[in-house]
Amino acid sequence: MKKDIHPKYTTVTVTCANCGNSFETRSTKESIKVDICSNCHPFYTGKQVLVDTAGRVERFKKRFAKKNASSSASE
């Protein structure tokens, strides 16, 4: 490897803007600020709210069934 061409790889503190949690990692940046971390993300905390897509799926199936029924009736 060539000398003096690589950036400094140091220990930095990652800070969450949402909950204020901070932890250390290594990076070429001086500090890292994230919007959401694993400490406050709904997927990791178990507070995940599922969006009700069942209505949309049922509506699609109903339209698809209507289209198939009309095309099979015309054949």
From Swiss-Prot:
Transmembrane regions listed in the UniProt entry: none
InterPro entries: Ribosomal_bL28/bL31-like_sf, Ribosomal_bL31, Ribosomal_bL31_A, Ribosomal_bL31_sf
Cited PROSITE patterns: RIBOSOMAL_L31
Pfam families hit by this protein: Ribosomal_L31
Lineage: superkingdom: Bacteria
UniProt GO MF annotations: rRNA binding; structural constituent of ribosome
GO CC annotations on file: ribonucleoprotein complex; ribosome
RNA-binding is among the record's keywords: yes
Keyword Ribonucleoprotein: yes
A biological process term (GO) from this entry: translation
Keywords, sorted A to Z: Ribonucleoprotein, Ribosomal protein, RNA-binding, rRNA-binding
Cited Gene3D superfamilies: Ribosomal protein L31 (4.10.830.30)
Family as reported in the entry's similarity comment: Belongs to the bacterial ribosomal protein bL31 family. Type A subfamily.
Subunit-level organization: Part of the 50S ribosomal subunit.
UniProt function note: Binds the 23S rRNA.
Protein name: Large ribosomal subunit protein bL31
